[in-house]
């Protein structure tokens, strides 16, 4: 009879749990169960201990906050992760946006906005600088000044990525001279889904989509259009009908306030009144605004 000896080796667990989640969006005044948003896995422990520190998250106020999650497995391995929590107002919002100004129509738009206690965003150009004081007025009134293009010449702007950023820098410098601030919100000429850029540089929009973010900008397209770009004489009622035919909770509405767009000014009061009657409020773009992107086609 042989006495057999068996040695047992225990491998030490040194692997931390893995914490994963998408960015968390909650409404103001809500009482979110943050644990339900978070997934924790471990190589050996099926039930790691999870600790959530939400002390920095202020659900009474809109904004972006950091939630700290700590996960500890039975071997004492600990993982910690900060997760972005966006607190949003559940109120239905219209973001009125105006491209191609300033012009003589910009001050008229500002008077209407003031009358209805509404805010808007102006994606400005450098094409009509005798009205640049309207940019200052718009900003002082609580609206957002954003960048569109200095020249609005597609052939120049979209000839190369270098040409695009040269144009963008020009309009940024112009706005900074007026307001003292260099905006970080932009709108591509024609929107990110435009195909006209393909006439001048194949694939440029796909490149710019990432390059603008790398340089600290955020671009905004729209999910509702007034149709006022169709011509310089679109009837006001057509603009009203187009503009009020959207039923999203968050609407980014495209207008133009260049010199020919007198019917846009004429239509604006009825559009604001329509959305007010449906429970919407009017906000300018800010860091808390949902991102509206089209699909890039070039």
Model region roles, listed by residue range:
Residues 1-2, 69:
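Sec-dependent N-terminal signal peptides of Gram-positive bacterial secreted proteins and lipoproteins
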Residues 5-11, 77-88:
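C-terminal edge beta-strand
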Residues 97, 121-125, 146-148, 186-189, ...:
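A cross-family glycoside hydrolase active-site/sugar-binding cleft signature
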Residues 130, 152-254, 258-276, 280, ...:
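Catalytic domains of cell-wall/extracellular-matrix polysaccharide-remodeling enzymes
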């Amino acid at each position: 009879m042989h006495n057999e000896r068996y040695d047992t080796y225990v491998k030490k667990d040194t692997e931390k749990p893995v914490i994963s989640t998408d960015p968390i969006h909650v409404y103001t005044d809500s009482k979110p169960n943050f644990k339900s948003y978070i997934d924790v896995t471990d190589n050996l422990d099926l039930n790691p201990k999870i600790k959530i520190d939400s002390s920095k998250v202020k659900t009474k106020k809109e904004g972006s906050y950091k939630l700290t999650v700590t996960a500890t497995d039975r071997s004492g391995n600990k993982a910690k992760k900060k997760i972005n929590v966006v607190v949003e107002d559940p109120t239905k919002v219209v973001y009125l946006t105006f491209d191609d100004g300033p012009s003589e129509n910009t001050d008229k738009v500002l008077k209407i906005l003031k009358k209805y206690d509404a805010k808007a965003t102006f994606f400005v150009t450098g094409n009509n600088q005798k009205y640049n004081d309207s940019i200052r007025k718009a900003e002082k009134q609580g609206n957002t000044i954003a960048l569109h293009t200095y020249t609005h010449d597609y052939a120049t702007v979209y000839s190369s990525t270098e040409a695009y950023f040269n144009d963008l820098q020009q309009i940024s410098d112009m706005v900074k001279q007026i307001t003292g601030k260099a905006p970080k919100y932009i709108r591509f000429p024609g929107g990110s889904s435009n195909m006209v850029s393909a006439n001048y540089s194949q694939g440029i929009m796909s490149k710019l989509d990432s390059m603008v973010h790398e340089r600290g900008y955020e671009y905004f397209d729209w999910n509702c259009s007034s149709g006022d770009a169709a011509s310089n004489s679109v009837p006001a009622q057509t603009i009203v009908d187009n503009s009020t035919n959207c039923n999203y909770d968050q609407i980014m509405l495209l207008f133009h306030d260049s010199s020919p767009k007198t019917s846009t000014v004429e239509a604006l009061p009825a559009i604001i009144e329509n959305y007010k009657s449906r429970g919407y409020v009017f906000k300018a773009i800010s860091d808390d605004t949902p991102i509206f992107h089209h699909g890039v086609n070039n």
